[in-house]
């Protein structure tokens, strides 16, 4: 023990030689390491590789950590050895020293060693990638996916609520034919359904654990039954069906499952960027922009312009999305840079992966609670813009042809007159025909 801390020499050495920046190993990863150590202690006892007293002392020490104690005992920087060995040893040292305290308290005169006992049947090279997968699965399932579904459910509700509000569509940021506000929002709803499916599809590969592969994937120094038993124990502890990776050489030498999974997080960030930017455009103005949506006025928008309401939730959301997209590049570079039997960019990769989950989870929750729930349509503005649009001329095209319809639209635009006036003036259409044919209500569904 060093200076009344539970860590030991290897942790202290890492603090000295890797005193870099402020990014620490994420607690989610620390927790996953602890869970592996807990189950390993039990499995090693069951396989008669570890005595009862030591195994129970290790388990008791782990349970203290899983209860939220001893967080200050894990101080290491992300910018350490690329295998995560120093964080694995940090965990081994803390558990060994705490287990020894518990044994002494119970007057049991034996010693728990960080390598010989806590790390038995393991290597940092199979423990750390397994902890990465565990942390990824748990945080995707319990944090990110639920908030995506929450937002998607609200979009579905809004799409039904606004299904009868007809508005002008826009392509290339130019006026297009009509659709309903509900139809527009239904696109956002379906984007999130797709994102959820894509993210969930990666959980199977993340459920493969490298444990039992030890140093290079051969399993040397691990009991032949260790891998299957430890995976079964982790599945019970975490309430998720993990399985032993079928090829340990792949699972040690690559981070492909994490790289692929983060690609779906980047996909979610892309979708959220589009949705947030759409809302910024639709709420712009409000008097001199599109102004079709009213967003909640959560806080003063300007220190100089009274009464200004800014789309701050959209801005926060899109900044988070930018960071996630940047994280994806870092993860891709790290994933592609492993050599031979081991990827040595793992701390970088899992730090960015878990940051992306936190950013998306928190941003989507805020975006939902403080923006989407309170969005309202500005009915008069929507109606005014719909009736002004020259693209309603598209309804005439099937009756008088494309060229004549285009001529009418150009005449209306150049002379500053209504589409109806230009149509009657052209002589191609009577007033009654215009009223019968140019009807936005009939332009929001396929032709019968």
Swiss-Prot record:
It catalyses: (S)-malate = fumarate + H2O. GO terms for biological process: fumarate metabolic process; malate metabolic process; tricarboxylic acid cycle. Substrate binds at residues 83-85, 113-116, 123-125, 171, 303, 308-310. GO terms for molecular function: fumarate hydratase activity. CDD domains: Fumarase_classII. Its EC number is 4.2.1.2. InterPro entries: Fum_hydII, Fumarase/histidase_N, Fumarase_C_C, Fumarate_lyase_CS, Fumarate_lyase_fam, Fumarate_lyase_N, L-Aspartase-like. GO terms for cellular component: cytoplasm. Pathway: Carbohydrate metabolism; tricarboxylic acid cycle; (S)-malate from fumarate: step 1/1. Homotetramer. Involved in the TCA cycle. Catalyzes the stereospecific interconversion of fumarate to L-malate. NCBIfam families: fumC_II. Belongs to the class-II fumarase/aspartase family. Fumarase subfamily. This is Fumarate hydratase class II. The gene is fumC.
